[in-house]
From Swiss-Prot:
There is a cross-link at Y241-M267 (Tryptophyl-tyrosyl-methioninium (Tyr-Met) (with W-91)). Binds 1 heme b (iron(II)-protoporphyrin IX) group per dimer. Its cofactor is heme b. Belongs to the peroxidase family. Peroxidase/catalase subfamily. One of its GO terms (cellular component) is cytosol. GO terms for biological process: cellular response to hydrogen peroxide; hydrogen peroxide catabolic process. This is Catalase-peroxidase. One of its GO terms (molecular function) is catalase activity. Its EC number is 1.11.1.21.
Amino acid sequence: MANESKCPFHQTAGGGTSNRDWWPDQLNLKILHQHSRKSDPMDPDFDYAKAFKSLDFQALKKDLTALMTDSQDWWPADFGHYGPLFIRMAWHSAGTYRIGDGRGGAGSGQQRFAPLNSWPDNVSLDKARRLLWPIKQKYGNKISWADLIVLTGNVALESMGFKTFGFSGGRADVWEPDEDVYWGSEKVWLGGDTRYGKAEAPGKGDLVAEPAKRPQEQGRNLAGERNLENPLAAVQMGLIYVNPEGPEGNPDPVASGKDIRDTFGRMAMNDEETVALIAGGHAFGKTHGAGPADNVGAEPEAAGLEQQGFGWHNTFGTGKGGDTITSGLEVTWTSTPTKWSNEYLNNLFNFEWELTKSPAGAHQWRPKDGKGANTVPDAHDTTKRHAPSMLTSDLALRFDPIYEPIARRFKDNPDQLADAFARAWYKLIHRDMGPLARYLGPEMPNEELLWQDPLPKAGPQPSEADIAAHKAKVLASGLSVAELVSTAWASASTFRGSDKRGGANGARLRLAPQKDWAANQGLDKVLAALEKIRDEGGNKISLADLIVLAGSAAVEKAAKDAGHAISVPFHPGRVDASQAQTDVESFAVLEPLADGFRNFSKARYSVKAEKLLLDKAQLLTLTAPELTVLVGGLRVLGANHGGSKEGVFTDKPGVLTNDFFRNLLDMGVEWKPTSADNEHFEGRDRKTGAVKWTGSRVDLVFGSHAQLRALSEVYGSGDAAAKFVKDFVAAWVKVMELDRFDLK
């Protein structure tokens, strides 16, 4: 407009070309500083677990049950029941979990934020969450969005006649999107070429939270199969699992079965659990594809302000009810879509199926010869009836040679399906919650499940005198500081803040598979010596506690030898798990394929070593200063894997000095690569040319990266020796106690 006032600002804060635009390969330390107090509106002393315990749980469930059939004009319930919609909401919240790095899942309510709130697979879930707002508003901070989303799915099942296995609360909300999760590199929704084109052949390794850069490959492994990039667990950008029309839209049930096995396996489900989840979930509700997709508007993150967080505005007909467009598929599986039954499997096997298309043009299946006509109700018009229909991914349960006998057994034994679905659903919605110590609420099952990494109950705790005696024996055992520190680190650093698995509690370092991991070679000698000390001391302390105590005693000694008298805090209470309590296959995903804190890498990866270090630090919930001080301290303590001298920038190994930083920042040293791949370096005296040090990428990044160098300068300063020791001890104790939820 001619009379429009000109804004004095062309851009506002945060706009313009960013550092990431200029240097896209730059190490992104921001992932270490997510979810801070600055983004959290709750009071500093707010305790969600305490608030949840004050919740009138049964009253909440009663309100949720009433909501199921309280259809709203602005978003009418299919078949008069919101249950199927809420099941999908809970499933899609939990279903983002993947075992590769433990990220994703329902644990913090991320479905409220980008990108998940705008994924194509989550169309209409904006409506589901908005239907819940009056209930969330009523109960306030006593129930988090994360818990409410999952609980609502459970109540939905119960309201339709299904007996669930239980529910546990304890998922605290966060207030901003996760920035550490790698969802893929595709730039368009539903793209899948990059995640298959980038996948490595077996035995190589493409992992962690940031994409690798390399030429496009064919997306097929050596056996000719689709090979999905790790750690991803979905076949296309913006999907939870598989394309329901079949791989890349190809309606091939057998090929779909292979995709299903891969994706569900990557979220910790075996074949029986997978069949149970699909057959159980598709006992309810329908999909939505009333018209062409070009009737659907922008997703929530791209929609106008007037939409108030809603997205996908639909201009087809009324845009709701019978005119809803979600996936583009128009499928109703059974004649009782709001009642638990075994009809899904009966229909799957009793009809022969032919390919057809939805009103939106998507591939789906109908019974041949017009069978099943008029057996299925319409979701909104009582005068209409339909035949049952299926997705390509449904037919995979019948035509995949592994799924078929499982599905047929469930068809013939409905009680087995009910039990398997109840257990698999419970696993789905709790998989990222960690140990039972985090579970809350009156509906927690009594049965302990192997996938929960069970631990025995703690017995009597060692006294202060017992602790002192064991520390003295450890230090007199002949074990070196490096051996004790590296063993404690190996035990504790398996923890993942993503799914709260791993850690020192349980002493699983001595059990399969951890005892056989490449990263843990040489630790058997230390473990044997510690077990002997424990036994000779009358078993007054668990091995799990003793491993940590021994490492902490070594840190105290190393600090004392550097002239700093400091006590490393130690809290007993850890227990020793048995091999029977340890699922070898489940724990295998915790193996450190690379651990920059120990200068260890099992193989060469397409991801740079410093990015693997950053990924590890984020999983350990470390800040950038904690990352920095730990690497510097572990190097001078000699904790490198296999006794490697790379990064040990000190002539006093085993003494807790700030020498790593002082020598890395020494301008008298010139660094040059010694390998063609720039993985290894040597530092030479600028005057004499003599080699003084050798280092890895992980070591040199602390002098190269501007932020890490700034932190290194703090710890390398002349007056920083005491601060370095203090900060190292604090970060050390943090890692040692990451899995001590009993202390929090």
